[in-house]
Design a protein with these regions (language model features):
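N-terminal glycine/threonine-rich, aromatic-flanked beta-hairpin/loop signature
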Residues: 25-66, 133-180
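A short, polar/proline- and glycine-enriched secondary-structure boundary/capping micro-motif
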Residues: 54-61, 79-82, 106-111, 159-163, ...
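Long, low-complexity, polar and repeat-rich extracellular regions
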Residues: 20-32, 46-48, 70-83, 88, ...
Length: 193
């Protein structure tokens, strides 16, 4: 009887394994511990920090067990004020790295953990359940139908209409229109979870 051994080597694709939601913190020039949430789909990254009131958009690469991202940084009204380069290591479900901004040349450290196991998979139906949130002093109520359409309103009588579509198992593409809301009226695009 002849016997043989079949050896299979699995090499994970870091890029695919990195899709999803990453949460953690960073410091600026050694000060603070600021919150940071990154939403990643393939090479696209949308990130935000509530405490620093900043939104970041950019590209991310995963060469081997490392990552590098180039981000444009915006204040909440959409005005671009800076760029950042973040580089570091990916170890299992964590990213740890250093960043530098331009033109201010602020530096800092960042640590993020993948939280895909704590978010609702895009494979699950959101179906007809209201979602309630609060933004500053504004109460927001939004519902999703079984076809991933968005409809809602808030306590300022603003109306929300739009659509979700799954980008991967944890991240949605979000297209939303805000109406009857004065200067906030318009079409907005981004990613969400």
């Amino acid at each position: 009887m002849k016997k043989f051994i079949l050896l299979i080597i699995l090499i994970p694709n870091i890029s695919l394994a990195s899709d999803g939601i990453w949460k953690g913190f960073f410091d600026i020039n050694g000060h603070g511990a600021y919150d940071f949430t990154a939403i990643i789909d393939k090479n696209n990254i949308y990130a935000f920090t509530e405490t620093a009131k900043t939104i970041c958009l950019g590209q991310i690469e995963f060469p081997k067990d490392e990552f590098k991202t180039n981000l444009d940084m915006y204040i909440l009204d959409g005005t671009k004020f800076s760029t950042a380069v973040i580089q570091g290591k990916v170890i299992e479900n964590a990213m740890s790295g250093k960043f530098v901004t331009q033109p201010a040349v602020d530096t800092g450290n960042m640590y993020l953990v993948n939280i895909n196991n704590k978010v609702i998979s895009t494979k699950e139906k959101l179906g007809n359940s209201p979602w309630i949130g609060k933004n500053n002093k504004t109460d927001i109520k939004i519902s999703f139908d079984n076809d991933s359409n968005i409809q809602g309103s808030d306590s300022n009588n603003c109306n929300y209409y739009g659509r979700l579509s799954a980008l991967n198992n944890f991240v949605y593409n979000v297209e939303i229109e805000i109406a009857s809301c004065g200067t906030s009226d318009g079409f907005y695009y981004g990613m969400g979870y």
